[in-house]
């Protein structure tokens, strides 16, 4: 072990917190990590050849924008292609190059080798104005064919987006039954942050070997990437999400069955750092140990960063200290994540860029990647060795040097051994060219009756299991919510406002599908909508939140799924089951029903499904019961609850939000209260941390003993149904708009001569439930 690594480990073991500097002030960059002189031999690795991709780095500006801006025109070269390197002869051969494909100089992204090692499937873009499509070729170069083609409604999709663009199919992978799983923008989702709708959010799809029978497997609101098949037949993949979390956390790793059923987290939901866990690969013979690249949200050149090991069954579900923090220990069994290359890491709060270890022991924050080495695309060849794409020169720019990345073999001791590089282009996705055992083909059983109605069944054996501080029998109801994706057809009618739903809180609107009862033993058995991003809230007898599921699950039509409690993290031990079945299973499954405030006899519309829209749900209650004291002139206690439209929202809403009277705000983007800290908030929160249990507003409206009620008792001001409506809104993380549809900026309160078709009656209009959950905009939105 060289002096560099010994010094690094010494710092780690004593828990030294290295000083962080900016690149301009840094000492000379770190030397090459320890390099073993012994050549890499086929006998050692167990295979003779490596298949890989040659091209320039992506030109992406974010980790999820490869399909948007990752392939600038200078990236399209005839010699881009798939190649095989022979470890015995030291020679390489081309399998296929862009010169022999349509356009003659396209861009190849990611490859996947068939289980028998005879075929390669890959994504290819012919030119900057064409979409990525899935192709296949024999490892001998024969049988080149295009597998996926533009959808029949490609032109209509682009028109809905309102941009001269296209769909993309990327990251293909063979399934055990011969089908191909891939990520695609055919779903017509866009990311939720940013000032425009031009950044797409692909999700997982699958298709038959001939490219037919394309099926969308997920309705995730934001991006899913890089599927890979585990030894047990499940699919592992990357998933970005933020359900009441900051937009820069929760870049997670999940699994699902090949048909999209039973999605389950491997790691990331409680990780409160900015690290993006991309390109996961299972460790040999072990599906709960994963190697991946830990990269940054931005900038990007194809997801480059540090090599990370994750053991989903070991240690704390949150990340441990960074290498520059007190208490850091290399290979610390207290935590699930280990950085194999700690001379580079993604700091938990500083973006953009990477942190590199310099010669003097300081860590350098560098946005250009020119202060150290970068890695990506790890492929495990044993339980301690990995083929990687490696930026050899520490001073090379992370994406502007064409041949910066080569194939190296690294190990858990920090050793680096050269394998292969090209004089002109970088080498990516190194994969052993050898056959693998075909995993079992999982064929989940679905209930045909529920599938026909686009429903699934959920069983909760004891919702109170794992809920600290919740008494037995305290949970009476579950509220079924959907996190809505933002479809291309929504446009950006709220522009220039950043958020479509709330003021620096949720960037997405939620709708309620109804509530279902919880039995005395904590069990529940009920229907849920299929192919929706569903999450639950545990409610008390007054339909107020006790705990919130800050993630979502997609249930496939006819799927039957169970969980053992509202524990907030996967991997918990299932409590022992007694001889008697849960009470909920002794009856028919519950159908989601309206809350009492939504019943027709109580003034509601009688529907279980509800759009939660502050201007029409909450403001009328304030107008009727509150503004006489909390009006525009000398409002009581300095709280003004009038409903005048502000630039994006309203007076009362902004008063409640600024003062956090509806409980703590969980900002999903830069917070007006906390600045950049609003991008995080990913850590697990125990019950009663959000919503009604922490709301001053609800306390004043329900507790006669509250100090605010000493002179003027507000606790009986609202009738039960009004209080229930306000309580439901409080449990939404300050949602203002109930859907993406409609004109939101105050400019649209009046007619606009430039848009004569616009009717001011549609200003901040409340969508119907069916409109809110729909893929296509209602006529009044356009």
Per-region residue spans from a language model:
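Bacterial N-terminal signal peptides
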Residues: 6-16
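Cleavable N-terminal signal peptides
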Residues: 10, 21-24
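Intrinsically disordered, low-complexity regions enriched in polar/acidic and amide residues
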Residues: 15-21, 109
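Aromatic- and Gly/Pro-enriched helix-to-coil junctions and flexible linker segments
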Residues: 23-41, 45-47, 77, 437, ...
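Sequence signature of WD/YWTD-type beta-propeller architectures
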Residues: 24-521, 527, 546-554, 558-562, ...
């Amino acid at each position: 072990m060289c002096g560099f690594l010994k010094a690094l480990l010494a710092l780690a073991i004593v828990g030294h917190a290295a000083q962080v500097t900016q690149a301009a002030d840094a000492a000379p960059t770190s030397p090459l990590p320890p390099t073993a002189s012994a050549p890499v031999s086929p006998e050692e690795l167990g295979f003779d050849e490596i298949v890989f991709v040659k091209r320039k780095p992506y030109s992406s500006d974010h980790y999820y924008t490869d399909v948007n801006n990752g392939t600038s025109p200078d990236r399209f070269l005839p010699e881009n292609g798939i190649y095989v390197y022979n470890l015995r002869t030291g020679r390489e051969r081309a399998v296929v190059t862009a010169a022999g494909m349509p356009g003659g100089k396209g861009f190849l992204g990611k490859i996947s080798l068939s289980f028998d090692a005879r075929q390669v499937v890959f994504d290819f873009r012919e030119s900057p104005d064409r979409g990525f499509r899935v192709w296949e070729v024999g490892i001998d170069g024969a049988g080149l064919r295009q597998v996926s083609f533009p959808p029949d409604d490609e032109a209509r999709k682009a028109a809905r987006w309102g941009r001269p663009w296209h769909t993309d199919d990327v990251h293909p992978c063979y399934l055990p039954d011969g089908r191909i799983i891939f990520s695609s923008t055919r779903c017509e989702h866009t990311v939720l942050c940013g000032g425009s709708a031009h950044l797409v959010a692909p999700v997982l799809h699958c298709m038959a070997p001939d490219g037919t029978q394309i099926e969308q497997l997920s309705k995730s609101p934001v991006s899913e990437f890089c599927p890979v098949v585990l030894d047990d037949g499940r699919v592992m993949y990357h998933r970005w999400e933020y359900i009441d979390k900051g937009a820069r956390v929760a870049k997670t790793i999940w699994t699902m069955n090949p048909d999209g059923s039973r999605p389950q987290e491997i790691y990331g939901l409680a990780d409160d750092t900015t690290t993006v866990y991309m390109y996961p690969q299972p460790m040999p013979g072990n599906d709960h140990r994963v190697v991946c690249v830990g990269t940054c949200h931005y900038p990007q050149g194809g997801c480059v960063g540090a090599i990370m090991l994750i053991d989903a069954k070991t240690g704390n579900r949150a990340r441990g200290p960074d290498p520059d923090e007190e208490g850091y220990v290399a290979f610390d069994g207290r935590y699930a994540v280990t950085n194999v290359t700690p001379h580079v890491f993604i700091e938990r709060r500083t973006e953009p860029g990477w942190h590199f270890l310099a010669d003097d022991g300081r860590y350098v924050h560098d946005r250009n990647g020119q202060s150290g080495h970068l890695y990506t695309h790890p492929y495990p060849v044993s339980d301690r060795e990995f083929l990687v794409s490696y930026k050899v020169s520490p001073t090379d720019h992370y994406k502007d040097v064409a041949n910066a990345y080569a194939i190296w073999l690294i190990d858990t001791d920090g050793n680096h051994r050269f394998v292969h590089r090209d004089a002109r282009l970088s080498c990516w996705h190194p994969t052993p060219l050898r056959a693998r055992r075909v995993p079992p083909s999982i064929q989940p059983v679905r209930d045909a009756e529920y599938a026909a109605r686009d429903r699934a069944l959920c069983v909760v054996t004891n919702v109170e299991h794992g809920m600290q501080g919740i008494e037995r029998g305290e949970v009476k109801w579950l509220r079924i919510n959907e996190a809505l994706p933002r479809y291309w057809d929504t446009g950006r009618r709220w522009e220039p406002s950043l958020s479509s739903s709330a003021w620096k809180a949720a960037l997405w609107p939620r709708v309620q599908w109804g509530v279902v009862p919880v039995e005395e033993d904590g069990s529940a058995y009920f229907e849920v909508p299929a192919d929706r991003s569903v999450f639950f809230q545990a409610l008390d007898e007054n339909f107020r939140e006790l705990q919130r599921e800050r993630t979502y699950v997609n249930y496939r039509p006819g799927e039957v799924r169970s969980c053992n409690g509202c524990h907030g993290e996967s991997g918990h031990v299932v409590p022992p089951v007694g001889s008697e079945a849960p009470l909920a299973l002794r009856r028919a499954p519950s159908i989601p029903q309206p809350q009492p405030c939504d019943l027709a006899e109580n003034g509601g519309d009688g529907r279980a499904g509800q759009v939660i829209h502050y201007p029409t749900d909450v403001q009328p209650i304030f107008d009727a019961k509150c503004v006489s004291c909390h009006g525009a002139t000398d409002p009581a206690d300095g709280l003004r609850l009038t409903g005048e439209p502000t630039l994006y929202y309203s007076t009362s809403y902004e008063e409640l939000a600024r003062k956090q009277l509806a409980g703590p705000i969980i900002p999903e983007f830069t917070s007006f209260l906390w600045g950049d800290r609003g991008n995080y908030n990913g850590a697990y929160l125990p019950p009663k941390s959000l919503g009604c249990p922490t709301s001053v507003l609800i306390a004043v409206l329900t507790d006669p003993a509250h100090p605010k009620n000493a002179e003027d008792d507000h606790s009986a001001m609202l009738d039960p149904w009004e209080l229930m409506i306000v309580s439901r809104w409080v449990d939404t993380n300050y949602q203002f708009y109930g859907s993406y549809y409609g004109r939101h900026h105050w400019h649209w309160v009046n007619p606009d001569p430039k848009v004569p078709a616009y009717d001011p009656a549609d200003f901040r209009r409340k969508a119907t439930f069916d409109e809110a959950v729909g893929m296509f905009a209602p006529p009044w939105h356009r």
